């Protein structure tokens, strides 16, 4: 009995320490306020509540909890040291108290508050499942039935709406999404509606399906990302719905707190960046396949024909959005294929692979038909496949590949640490649950996805956002782990053994603190909303449009109905969007591509005055054909950037690009 008690304390301490690390995710001390308030509230609530007709927790329970708190503080301190070293806040000779003190404060509060916080969260929403003798708290797979009720749909939509509205710069709560990549996608997408063919007429590097999605956003709003905001809400709703179904599959319980934790961890990660990335929009596609894989493994069955076709359809969509994310599917198919071959089901496997290929072909046919009709298949191959594989990447040797993978892991620890922690936690817990097949499946999916993303040697902040597809399973495993360890679950199990009524025991266990449950139903959603402001984008909430260079320059160009423009020295800063201008040159902005042709063409644009205007960020234009018209400055996440708008000083030249007028 004493050994079990020690194990229980250790589980509490590890849970608290793990959650403490999650609390320390934000890079800025100001973002730690919401987690600190959260833990303080939940430290006070559980131990101060009493139920009708029942006494408060006895002295022994308080003593065990106090011991667990002290042990948790020890673990929190150890994690804090490692964390500060990782964030380079601690050196060998000095300690930056000004930067580290807020982290230390939250570590102490988080270490103590995580125990009642995690236990309380699981009791706040008892769910609607029926307990069984096998599991009084988590009944496990609900027979494969994961139907989402109307109430759940409303909850999912509300969570998606609030999350995207707070975390994405595309939201109306923010003045403008100034992320250069999102503006590139929007510019190419709207150009497609005017007959401009990507790659052939307008050079960019992402997939054509991504541009088609942004083309759908243009009719909603020509000069803002209102359409992009709606697109992100739809993607978040689809992703969270599939995550919810996977949680129902593994636990059989409706736990709204699962949605809150999952949404907060995925969309406040620094890898989320500013919203509208290819990775963010592809999350529901990967989550669909991941959910089907989990269902096959946990229910011990094979993929159905419908599931195989939909997996192929989703992978085909990912192929034409950003094919470097296809590594997930390479790892995904290995475990199901091995199980079928081991059971002598080779013909069945071939049939399913054929259906997957049919799904890929179905997704690819419209893309190939579009470029074939415009006689631009060669441009599609050169720009999207060849240049990205052999020009954009740096992995020219095996050593460079290993360097790219190491750099990618360091990037994940900095910008998407929650995913790494939860993947490791998932693998350990699945292995201890004797579910080795599921652990192997998750491991292969993660390794192949991670490998294909970073093997090319390029490492950008937002690359790891697609790996957030593993967060829902990690949150589910964390909740299961804490649920098995909490004291109320033990009491419910003991009462069930005495009375022979596990249903009654489960119900009594959840009703021990009804006041806490009622308070939590109000407090938790509020704290979830506050936690979303830990997003790196929240600093833009106080910005006005009139202060942003994109709108300052757009005001200057508002009377120009036939203006031509190209973006020099950087990716699309957003003037094409705010001024509603169509690009008139193939290289409309400076891409992250070591291309001599692009540099040569842009020098030609500047030398011969091809466009009427040039906009630049942080780089001055030195050309006799242009003169400086306007300047502006804007502080982006603490860094001050100068912006320049140039106007053609001559009448142009015979090489000037034809103007493509907007209606």
Predicted regions located by residue number:
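Perimembrane helix-loop-helix junctions
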Residues: 328-361, 486, 505
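Hydrophobic/aromatic-rich transmembrane helices and adjacent perimembrane loops
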Residues: 97-108, 327, 450-494, 498
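Membrane-interface alpha helices of multi-pass inner-membrane proteins
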Residues: 17-24, 306-325, 329-335, 362, ...
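Short periplasmic/luminal acceptor-recognition loop of GT-C membrane glycosyltransferases, typified by
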Residues: 540-595, 602-621
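Short acidic/glycine- and proline-prone juxtamembrane loop motifs at membrane-interface regions
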Residues: 272-282, 460
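Hydrophobic, aromatic-rich transmembrane alpha-helices
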Residues: 43, 47, 116-117, 241, ...
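Transmembrane-helix signature of polytopic, membrane-embedded enzymes
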Residues: 243-266, 300, 306, 440
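Transmembrane-helix motifs of polytopic, lipid-linked glycan transferases
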Residues: 230-252, 288, 292
